[in-house]
Amino acid sequence: MSRVLSRRGWRTGFFWMTMWSGAVISTSFTSMAQTVADVRFTDITSQLHIDFTHQNSATSNKYLIETMGGGGALFDYDNDGRLDIFLTNGALLSDPMRDGANPDKSDKRYWNRLYRQNADGTFTDVTERAGLSGRPQGYYSMGVAVGDYDNDGFEDLYVTGYEGNILYHNNGDGTFTDVTEKAGVGGGGWSSSAGFFDYDNDGKLDLFVTRYVDWSFKTNRYCGEKPPLGVRAYCHPDNYDGMTNILYHNNGDGTFTDMSVKAGIANPRGKGLGVAFADYDGDGFTDVFVANDSVQCFLYHNNGNGTFSEVGLLAGVGYNEDGKTFAGMGIDFSDYDNDGRPDIVVTDLSNERYMLFHNEGNGLFRDVTNASGVGGATLAFSGWSTHLFDYDNDGWKDLFVAQSHVMDTIEKTSPNLRYLEPPLLLRNVSGHFTRVLPGEPFQRAWAGRGAAFGDLDNDGDVDIVANNLGQKAYVLRNDGGDRNNWLGIQIMGTKSNRDGIGARIKVVSASGFTQYFTVNTAAGYLSASDKRVIAGLGKDATAKLVEIRWPSGIVQKFEDVKARQYLKAVEPSQ
């Protein structure tokens, strides 16, 4: 029997109990946070007709999978210029899951859901019409990736889960077809986050899949204390072996080849939860960061020859500054300080702080968690999906985190912690982060998990859609972020992949302020976001330069671009 006080505490329970019984950390969610008068986020879920409730099918057996889902995506599946919403769901579990029993998604309550945005901004559930309803027994959905893998101009969906993944091809007529078997991307085991990227710059999107632990209903263990002395709890991942990640190469004919072993991805084993992509060393090839849960995080350097080298330890991002592992969950790989080099942020459990690694430009990263203000603002929280985006369009990327402890029993063993937590927003002021409360939703507690980001109403500021464990999803509209000027950039590749994923964009505003972006859909936790880039311009009415470095190597420039519009850029032939 394993003792669990916090999720990590079964190994060192007395230490964690005594540490927190004497800790002087406020559990008030509003203490030490600043209010922001100019920008508010408004919960508009009900008025948009979004009625999704995540069904994790919690049981008394504390099956580990119950506490880990679900994800979401913001993407325009029908090319009408309006973002649509996809949310993943769990499955019906029996209590207990007897030999031979499988998760069951046949009941509509457990379906993943696709919501199409109407012309008036409301949404209609089109799941069944789109061919995305139900699923045979044995499948429990986790995350979602978005990308146009066949370059036909329509965004496809890849849904991860327990005991198999699904690739849905977008037919271009409002429907999807399950092509998993033909494509050869079914995976296996417990897959978590996934993302499309072009690792060999051949113009076709490849697919990276993170996998968590080698767990099954049969191997699920009893963790915690037996009643009446204590309560049963979800087991720490140390109770289970890790799994290898999967790299699928796009063959260009609708099929993929598993290149994990040949490319150097299959070793070592990890406990992957989040994945993100960026070219951290500027060599023109996209690298991969995997957030692992309580084992070393992985940074896969792309060698440019179809192989990767795992350099997390050497680069300084495998462990925290004390040389310890942490419970890596959500991840973003983006330039927070506008120096042209993508940095790494990783969410974590309470007591540990979220990690921020600054890219030093020499292949190394420096842990700036405390110096940046992120450490002090996050010590008492547990974070999942995260994203660096400029919510107030002042030119600095701010940090959002969907939050909740992983243990629904945490308050019984650690009274200073909370299971339900409000989302977190840290405002970036010239590279230093301070917590802000931009509206009532940031004082409301949820079981946050996945979150996706994008401009739902095309007004130039970023909105948020979050999927909450066992709760209703929410949509937060950004009200006031467009008071500052902004420039949206939507690109289409010709020689490069059609989505332009992996393209690097530099924006120089009229005053000379410079920002850098990487075109991506994958980041956070189990989720996929709008591929369009939004650059906050502050009071500047123009961008004097927009420079796009395509994955093909082509460099494209636009000059004197007016603010408050979406610039549409098509990759030139040379």
Segments (PLM) and residue ranges:
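Bacterial N-terminal signal peptides
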Residues: G13-S28
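Gly/Ser/Thr/Pro-enriched helix-cap/hinge segments flanking short amphipathic alpha-helices
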Residues: Q34-R40, A58, G376, R418-E421, ...
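Blade-edge beta-strand/turn elements of extracellular beta-propeller
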Residues: F41-I44, T122-L132, D173-V185, G254-A266, ...
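Repeat-based blade/solenoid architectures
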Residues: I50-G71, K108, A130-A145, G184-G195, ...
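Short, conserved, GDST-rich strand-edge loop motifs in beta-rich repeat architectures
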Residues: T88-D107, R211-Y240, V401-Y419
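Beta-propeller blade signature
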Residues: Y110-N118, M243-N251, H301, F357-H358, ...
